[in-house]
Amino acid sequence: MLKATQVNNLDIFTPAKWQTVILRNYGLVKTNLIAKVLKCTTKRVDIEAARLGIEQIRYKMVWREKSYITIIRNNWNLLNYEQLLTLLDMSEEELTYNLDNNDFLGIKLGNFKPEADFVYYQKLSKEEIKQTHKIQKILKKYFIENYVSPFSFEYNKSNGKNYDKHDRIIYPYSLECGDVFLKTSKAISNEELEAYSSNGINGLWIGAKLRDLCYYPFSKKKDKKYLKRRQNLNEFIDFAKSYGLNVFLYLNEPRGINLNELDPKYDHLKGRIEGEIVALCVAHKEIQNYLYKSTKELVKNIPNLDGIITITSSENLTHCKHVPGSDCKVCKDYRPYELACLINNTMFKAIKDAGSKTRIIANQWGWAPYCDYLPGEAKKGIDLLDQNIEIMCVSEFGTHKKGNHFYDIGEYSLSHAEPCIETIELLNYAKQKNHKILGKIQVNNSWEMSIVPYVPCFENVFNHLKKLRELGVNDYMLSWTLGGFPSAALSLASSCNYDDWLNQNFGNDYEAVKDAIHEVSRGFSYFPFNTKLLYLSPLNQGPSNLLYRNVTNRKATMVTFPYDDVSSWVSKDEENDFINKMQNLIKHFKKALKILMAINNPSNDILEIIRYLNVWTICYESTLNQYLFNLNKVDENKNLNIYLNKELKLTLELYKLASLDSTIGFEASNQYVFTQNTFLEKIINIILLKKNV
């Protein structure tokens, strides 16, 4: 588990800390577990929930089954490890696995655990009862009774069938990023699969590890759980194929292993060490043989697997030169691209020798300077790859040119949706070398806005796809773990005429929708793109992020805890530019909303666009508002109520929208960013601050 570290405590907004435990968890966690944490009775938990005014929130087991990350995040700063494990009803081993393996969860939480004292129930004083009664009145006033149930997703079905059979690969919207196939073969519903098929999708990609699907010799623990995963995965592949959907495994190999887990007889294979994880250096013949045998075992035992997408430079420790800074002496004479090609070619040979038709697609993510690739080395890598290995580039990830100005886009983006200079060069080169080529893009959303299933910037998406087609790219991976919703936007990948697509989806209202979407694109062009802003600001939490009167001195964490760390959100020299661009962006978004809301008798599809554009606008407005609040709160003479009043308005608007649609606030790797409880706590937070500023 992550190291427990002493940091400044965060303010709470209930009279007693144990009340915050109830406020954040009532309805998400069984009352007997809350009672066990607080050392009181379940009856007492119910009484105190009623005293707070939240007794109408009903417990739903699905929170623990499908959104345990939400519960972890809600209590990360509130409870110590012992009480957190009790609340989750989770073993230390299971929590450690999730922190280490569930899409960088440990990093997102800050890579450490804030120390916390034990929190136990204590009888309230008369003054605390009085304060609690005031909170009850507030929450009764704003409580929404029919808040939508989590995971009650309704999927769009279109007639956007992909008749040309080019690859349209996506990550399943509802699929968690953990150890899915240990639990079930029915990881995705019939309705979701049917919706993908109807929107032109013919492939699903799923993250996996060879060690979880094949015999793994290097661990002290030898178990056979991989057999169960394999069985479930085979059943799932057959299930998906019944809807015309192929399955691709996304592999980042050979994975490092925890130092404590490594069998000592393999110590000689150790390479680069990062924290508690050690690479098994792929320059060793033993590791190459393992990679060969495991890949061969995989495709022989999962015969209907359509493809493997490899990533050979990434945040995960795989080969010793996956990122700069290796001190391994075994592979010191290798360049990163040589190790990447060694991995890809070894896996391809295993597939070929197995007589399998499983494809290998080499993702070029990280074949770039930030992973220590020198100019020209990505092309050298393509030269080294077997000609039957397919090449995929993250289209927008790299250098862009506007006029005489060059700038970098270092994340998935819909605001800068076009192939970058490096993508154009590499895909053209790979095509000349007779490799099949694919483009990786985002169609639905990105970290610019991840908490709605799609953002309505269809014009940007269509233009991006058009530019890729002009390069000869007709096969696409259409999402990362975010952006997998089966929306009508997916069928853009199989449409060559934007107006026809609009007419098909919006009928007589398509011209008004086109005008509104153009306004969205104009506004989005102002977006002050910066990876720190995407990862560390509240763009993807919006008004659910709590405010604090005093500076917390907490550092923002990746897409999880923005806190009040404004200097990490936006650098000081970019302050005015950020404010001006966000104001312009919001102005255009509101103009787009005005156009859409003027449509008479709008269809459900248009109402959905209005809803998601509203959420998007609210979150951006709140980010700007929180930024100004936190900048100004250090000056005691500043009137902060102007920001608090606006934040309350935005909070109530988002709360209302989220109560109507279970997709709002959900994203596969982070699960639910907010719940009804989150909004109720934020309302108390703002009203108490208003009284004290």
Label each residue range with its predicted role.
Residues C40, M90, I201, Y243-L245, ...:
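Short glycine/serine/threonine/alanine-rich loop segments
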Residues R64-E65, N101, G106-K113, Q122, ...:
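Feature activates predominantly on carbohydrate-active enzymes
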Residues N159-K165, S185-S189, K300, D333-V693:
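Substrate-binding groove of N-acetylhexosamine-processing glycoside hydrolases
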Residues P324-Y334:
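A solvent-exposed, charged loop/short amphipathic helix patch at secondary-structure junctions
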Residues V45, E192, F236, M347, ...:
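Aromatic/hydrophobic pocket-lining residues that form π-stacking "cages" and hydrophobic walls in ligand
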Residues M1-Y163:
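Long, charge-rich, low-complexity intrinsically disordered regions
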